[in-house]
Amino acid sequence: MTFPPLKSPLKFYAVVPTADWVGRMVKAGADTVQLRCKALHGDELKREIARCAAACQGSRTQLFINDHWREAIEAGAYGVHLGQEDMDTADLAAIAAAGLRLGLSTHSVAELDRALSVHPSYIASGAIFPTTTKQMPTAPQGLDKLREYVKQAGGTPVVAIGGIDLNNARAVLATGVSSLAAVRAVTEAANPEAVVKAFQALWDG
């Protein structure tokens, strides 16, 4: 089982709750966006994911769908992001056969080993700093552990997530990760589009 490699580096990775937010991120020029939608189900969820795919079509933005792999395949999304618990229930072979990229969350050395065993397109490591976005199973990882995870991942791209903002972004990038993911730094910003551009400038200058 092999998942496609990334077509281009993930760089700044915005995690947002709705298709409207996805559209805003595309217009702002975000390299990567993830729909993390917990509020919708059934046909409403399918329509929301289809709207996300339409918003990203023809743009530079790479669209990942959190958890909902069946709907992501149906909508023709760029990829799927799964948590550790989802690895037990998702049909990874179906995701690979559909040509979608796969990202996996990790919170420890053991989880990273498990994720790498299925050869994902990238792994996410976190939470790096304290975060209130979601309940985390482990304490914040910090930058020293993150450096070790980057080494352990080898050639697999690593996305750092959890409490990342423009104040600590450069220090996180210095660990060797290829991408920074942000939730609250975008969705709670007075000017989210300006935040996206400031993050992008860390790579694009």
UniProtKB/Swiss-Prot annotation:
Superkingdom of source: Bacteria
According to UniProt, the reaction catalysed is: 2-[(2R,5Z)-2-carboxy-4-methylthiazol-5(2H)-ylidene]ethyl phosphate + 4-amino-2-methyl-5-(diphosphooxymethyl)pyrimidine + 2 H(+) = thiamine phosphate + CO2 + diphosphate; 2-(2-carboxy-4-methylthiazol-5-yl)ethyl phosphate + 4-amino-2-methyl-5-(diphosphooxymethyl)pyrimidine + 2 H(+) = thiamine phosphate + CO2 + diphosphate; 4-methyl-5-(2-phosphooxyethyl)-thiazole + 4-amino-2-methyl-5-(diphosphooxymethyl)pyrimidine + H(+) = thiamine phosphate + diphosphate
Record-linked InterPro entries: Aldolase_TIM, ThiamineP_synth_sf, ThiamineP_synth_TenI, TMP_synthase
Return the Pfam families for the record.
TMP-TENI
Does the keyword Transferase feature in the UniProt annotation? Answer: yes
Cellular component terms per the entry's GO annotation: cytoplasm
Binding of Mg(2+) occurs at 67, 86
Pathway of this protein?
A: Cofactor biosynthesis; thiamine diphosphate biosynthesis; thiamine phosphate from 4-amino-2-methyl-5-diphosphomethylpyrimidine and 4-methyl-5-(2-phosphoethyl)-thiazole: step 1/1
The EC number of this protein is: 2.5.1.3
Q: Which GO terms describe its molecular function?
A: magnesium ion binding; thiamine-phosphate diphosphorylase activity
Q: Give binding positions for 4-amino-2-methyl-5-(diphosphooxymethyl)pyrimidine.
A: 34-38, 66, 105, 134
Q: Which SUPFAM superfamilies match?
A: Thiamin phosphate synthase
Q: Supply the enzyme class, top level.
A: transferase
Binding sites annotated in the UniProt record for 2-[(2R,5Z)-2-carboxy-4-methylthiazol-5(2H)-ylidene]ethyl phosphate: 131-133, 163
Q: What does this protein do?
A: Condenses 4-methyl-5-(beta-hydroxyethyl)thiazole monophosphate (THZ-P) and 2-methyl-4-amino-5-hydroxymethyl pyrimidine pyrophosphate (HMP-PP) to form thiamine monophosphate (TMP).
Report the family membership.
Answer: Belongs to the thiamine-phosphate synthase family.
Spell out the protein name for this chain. Answer: Thiamine-phosphate synthase
